[in-house]
Design a protein with these regions (language model features):
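Charged, alpha-helix-forming regions
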Residues: 2-313
Length: 313
């Protein structure tokens, strides 16, 4: 596997290709792999995210975390572990804290990748950092490239431990990314998903919101990470005009791990809800300030992908 530290200053966009024998940067793909991995690859190709990565998200509802914030201090005091318990399940984030910035980058890789291949018991995904910068509306320069690379390395460092609310005895532990490298041959970066994450993807519900993704990441400005987190949470629910999902403000803030220890933080949350009312409405989310109640009546172009049968050995 060829390695380089950087892409060219402004690399050309890699073209999507039809996989051919022995063409891959990653050799011997599929030759000694169980067939279930090809099903998993197809499932990942058809998904934007796992449902639980949105509903009980390891990504904090902010774009940046200050080192002296209460959340960061709690994380360090607890030996770099953050545990979140919700009505939908429990998640532990270990080693590093992740934000909506990291989530957008990961989603860009999932949605706008060049291609994916089966590789050594897991899945590898080719992508362009330049394309990610374009999708996020960032000016392309060395600093932007470095920041995105570092963000992906952050994701690689994190260990996620999940417990299902319905089955507390079932626990999943995984890194999302096993490694990241650059191929001069392909003119693209490649991330290799950990085999544990591929297994988790295989056995859990995933969600496809690709058709709404560009609209979601176009929500920008102060408070936008908070609003995106709300949208990501609600779209995991199978709602409709005849099956409206409702939730009180404080329950939602606790579920998405929004800091609400002080009256000022709650006031800020309410102000963001007012400022981004139209963006929420595009995803059929309505907030009633008087009763402090959310209503969600379902979003078009959202698709749920069921778990595959069996597990990856």
């Amino acid at each position: 596997m060829a390695e380089e530290n950087n892409e060219k200053k402004k690399p050309s966009s890699p073209r999507k290709r039809t996989p051919k024998k022995n063409m891959s940067l990653l050799p011997d793909e599929g030759q000694m792999i169980q067939y279930s991995l090809f099903d998993t690859k197809q499932k990942i190709n058809e998904s934007t995210s796992t449902l639980m990565d949105l509903r009980v998200s390891p990504f904090m509802p902010v774009d940046k975390i200050s080192h002296n914030s209460a959340l960061a201090r709690e994380f360090v005091a607890n030996k770099n572990i953050l545990k979140r318990e919700t009505a939908f399940g429990t998640v532990e984030i270990r080693n590093r804290l992740l934000t909506q910035y990291h989530k957008m980058i990961l989603d860009c890789i999932m949605v706008h990748n060049v291609r994916s291949v089966v590789y050594k018991g897991t899945i590898a995904i080719y992508f362009s950092i330049y394309e990610i910068a374009q999708q996020l509306g960032l000016e392309w320069n060395g600093k932007t490239q470095k920041n995105i690379q570092e963000a992906i390395e952050y994701i690689k460092d994190v260990v996620i431990v999940r417990t299902d609310a319905d089955n507390p005895s079932i626990t999943s532990s995984y890194n999302i990314i096993q490694e990241m490298k650059y191929s001069s041959k392909e003119q693209a970066y490649v991330i290799v998903l950990s085999s544990q994450y591929a297994e988790y993807f295989n056995k859990t519900i995933s969600i496809n919101y690709n058709k709404r993704f560009d609209e979601l990441i176009a929500i920008r400005g102060k408070g936008s990470a908070f609003i995106r987190s709300i949208i990501e949470f609600f779209i995991t629910h199978d709602a409709s005009a005849d099956n409206i999902q409702r939730m009180k403000l404080m329950q939602l803030l606790e579920t998405i791990n929004y800091p609400c220890e002080t009256p000022r933080q709650i006031t800020s949350a309410k102000q963001y809800l007012k400022e981004y009312e139209n963006e929420l409405a595009k995803f059929s989310i309505k907030y009633y300030s008087g009763s402090q109640l959310f209503e969600y009546s379902g979003t078009t172009d959202i698709r749920f992908i069921p778990p595959l049968d069996g597990f990856i050995d």
